[in-house]
Amino acid sequence: MNVCSKKFALLPFVFLIGWLLVTAGLAVAQVSVPTHYLGNGVNMEVVGYNDLQGRPSYMPNVQKQGSRYILYASEHVGTGAYLNPMNGKMEYDGTSILDVTDPQDPIYLKHLPSLYGPPNNEARHVRTCAGSDLPGNLYPGKYFMVRSDGQISHTLWDVTNPANPILISKLIDNLTYTHKESWDCVSGYIAMPKSSTTWKSTGSACTTIPGAGCDIAIFDLHDPYNPKYITDWGLVGQTPGSTVTPVPAMVHETVISTDSVYGTRLYGAYGISVSGDGWLQVADLGKILALGHPVATDEDILAAQIGVQKMSYEFGMHSFWPWLHIPMADFAQNYPASAGPVPGNTNPQVQDFGLASTESTNNGCVGWRAMAVVVDLNYPSEPETIANMSVPALQGKKEFDFCANDARFGSHSISEDLYLPFHNRFNAIAWFSGGVRIWDLRNPFQPVEVAWFIPNINKNTEQNCATRNGVTSCDTVVGTNNAATDDRGYVYIVDRYGSGTDVLQLTGNPKTALFNLTPP
């Protein structure tokens, strides 16, 4: 039986103002933005908005280009072609490029469609680097973008003029699966998820070759005009000749990050979603390079792998991000610890962690609840989950019953930004119908949610449907898909279902704490 209803996920904004003003004394956003663009929140307010031409968006990436701040918003495959009012043409999804130098007035500069038509008319992921940030400073004044084009290619672009991107090359082509790249501008190395005809994985039909799967391709991209393939990468059991069973779940993202103390590491998230059979992996890129040849065996992986954590089956891992060198105010009086049997941190006053998230993939609260977790990396060979970040389905009064609608509810991804004021202090986590949630992680053992914001639906918001006990129903509900931050303290969110992008800022005590750069 199919029952289709179109209704709002939340009660009217005016009602919510009244409720919030009588609870906790927390402020609600009231800014000079059209009323139907305002949302509902605590300790966050809208600064600016753009509808992104009504396109479903996957992730925002903010790049400072000289004195300008440029937002690159990647796009999911939508219901078809959308009108680009800048040229009057119907275009498939790709990348929206905006100037957000003035966050109150985001200016749409360019829509860059995917290189391909259906079903690959999308570009879900985007990463950028300044030429001056890459090793060797070979191209000062230039800016580069890598994106996934459909499920076919990872492509490289010159975006020095963001209103006129120029295709440089296809880094990898002729694939059947692409996903979330990670480009480390410090080392120049990039990790790109892809389909493989030889490497193995479970959990997704990401290749048409029986017994094959998905892995990571690592390139040296310090010179964008001369990319160099380094190796494929994955988990023990996924290499071409491995006989390990069961074969581990597919990779979603491997972050490459360079640290002044630990060098360049890989932080891999495998399994993706709830019931995804997740894994977290830490590896040393220097040891991969020291092999002198592409990784081909499980023994090669073990030579470079620092540690791995098998998650409980319900937690597939979507993202894994380093959260290192955290000043621990509560440990300020602790003396150094004795060295352990394996290499690790011995200073309790400054500790190492990672942030990871599961993706909520089931609409209507069917199955396990997705959440984010904190991982202890003081001894990276033995990573250990120590805390979680979860949002209750019934938050306050009944207008916040997130399981009462047909949308996704749960975590999707953590924000991956490397600069203050957010980095190593607060993190913005996208929570689909739960909007964006801001977590204070200055004490990673005890994460505290300090702010949140849920946009309202608008004329562009697409429907979500869920099937429970054989009955299908539909709602029009927002889906905050990803969040990013910049060095000015703004938060950028994009909507999976076409509601646009919001530029937000913290208010009240969280804003004060964010810009107080001393330990709590």
Predicted regions and their residues:
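Bacterial N-terminal signal peptides
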Residues: 12-24
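Bacterial N-terminal signal peptides that target proteins for export
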Residues: 1-15
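Feature marking well-ordered beta-strand scaffolds used for ligand recognition
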Residues: 28-520
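Short intrinsically disordered, low-complexity coil segments enriched in acidic
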Residues: 2-3, 20, 99, 158
